[in-house]
Every structure is written in C-alpha cells, then in structure tokens.
Amino acid sequence: MSSLLLLTNALQPSTEVLPALGLLLHNVRVAPAEGPALVDTPGADVILVDGRRDLPQIRSLCQLLRSTGLSCPLVLIVTEGGLAAVTADWGIDDVLLDTAGPAEVEARLRLATGRQQLGGDDSPMEIRNGDLSVDEATYSAKLKGRVLDLTFKEFELLKYLAQHPGRVFTRAQLLQEVWGYDYFGGTRTVDVHVRRLRAKLGPEHESLIGTVRNVGYRFVTPEKPEKGEKSDKSEKAERAEKAERAETPGKAAAETNEAAGARSSKV
C-alpha cells in the first residue's frame, strides 16, 4: 500500500477525481493544487496532480514542483482531451486518464515508484553544452564554472534553448513554451530576455544564443576543432620550430665569417 498525495482544487472527494482510487487500498490524502501545500503536508510515495481543468495553471504547478527537487514521482491526471497539451517540459513522470481502471492505475503507480527506487542514486538532471551547464534541480546555470545570476524566466529560456541545441524557435513558440499559455504579453518580451541573457553570458559567449533572421532564436553548440586538424597544426608548428632552431647556428656562423672578412679587408 502506497501513500498518495492528490493535489486538486475540486470540491469533490478523491474518488470523483480518479474513481479507480476508491477500488484500491492506497492511503490517499488531498491538498490544494498549490505549491505551498507541500510545505504543510507530509511526504508521499507518489504525488497525483488533478489536471482535468485549467491546464496552464497545472502546467506551471508541475514545473514548480519539479524545480524544488521533488524526490517522489509526479503523476498527472487529465481528461482525454487534455492529453494533447501535455509535453515533456511539464516535468511529470507519468500521465493517467481520469477514466483509467484500477488495474491500470495500480500498474502505473507501481512502475512509477519502481523507477524512482532504481534511479534513486542518480545525480540531478543536468544539461551540459560546451562550457555551459544547466542544473534543473537547483535552478542554476554555470558558464566555465561561473554561476550566472539569472532571473526565473531567464533561466527557463536558457534551459529550454539548451535542451534543443540547433533547433530554431519562433518568438511565439518560445512565448508559449517558456511563459505559458496564460501569458498575454507580446513577443517583444522574448527579445528583451534574449538581450539580457546575452549580456550575462558575456561578449565571449553571447553567440551561444543565435538569431535566425525573420524567424527567431536557437542555441548554438560551440564547434570543437577536429582531432586530425589539431594534430596537423601541431606537427606543422613543431617542424617550423625545429627548422628555425637548426637554421639559427648556421646564420650565426655566416654572420661571424662575414664580419671577420670585413675586418681583414680593411687591414
């Protein structure tokens, strides 16, 4: 029997949110679908989030929960129509239809807790790209070991671009994915945040966020020199240095003989 925490704003009992729970022997506690609810609520084996309504708010809640370093599986409950809105960046471990039967619910809960136990020793998820590292667990980003002082949205924007290196996103796409469906500001917001991000990356690394004219932005992966090319250059430099060293004694001897000849002719 597992300890389940159901986050919901519905005034219905848990068996109305997910009827199959009424046929299973798990211990279910209910709390408001808000981030602070976790502070006043004891830990759980699995957190269930009621996403049958208000998907933009629930998406933000799931991302917030994941950003706090949540150590237990996060399972989203949605209607069949809500499945189309769910993507990987929600930060959830699994998704359940509210009409799922008890056998399916039991299997998914068992798999979610099993994966958590198997992966319990894994380090927090970190995105590495060249000199840049983005730690989703601590919401921090480092460039050559230097911690970047980023706002929440600057971090989210950098993380999203770094997760998809080379892929071009329009301003509208970034606005939807980073700011959310419920944001009603203009795409100019994206330009402002990109400009601030580049300033914080510094002149040497501002090109990590590339502009695709008349389209949008992309994360540019730093190019690494080919091993063969690097070794060829090293060999050429080494040969040139050896030749210069071999030539130097000859030049010195010639200059000495020339000077001696000049003195004897004067005499």
From Swiss-Prot:
Residues 220-267 are annotated as: Disordered. It comes from Streptomyces coelicolor (strain ATCC BAA-471 / A3(2) / M145). Gene3D superfamilies: 3.40.50.2300, Winged helix-like DNA-binding domain superfamily/Winged helix DNA-binding domain. Coiled coil: none annotated. The keyword Zinc does not apply. Keywords: Activator, DNA-binding, Phosphoprotein, Transcription, Transcription regulation, Two-component regulatory system. This is Transcriptional regulatory protein GlnR. GO terms for molecular function: phosphorelay response regulator activity; transcription cis-regulatory region binding. Residues 124-221 bind DNA. Residues 221-248 have a biased composition (Basic and acidic residues). Activates the transcription of the glnA gene. SMART domains: Trans_reg_C (SM00862). InterPro entries: GlnR_N, OmpR/PhoB-type_DNA-bd, Sig_transdc_resp-reg_C-effctor, WalR-like, WH-like_DNA-bd_sf. The modification 4-aspartylphosphate is found at residue 50. It comes from the Bacteria. One of its GO terms (biological process) is regulation of DNA-templated transcription.
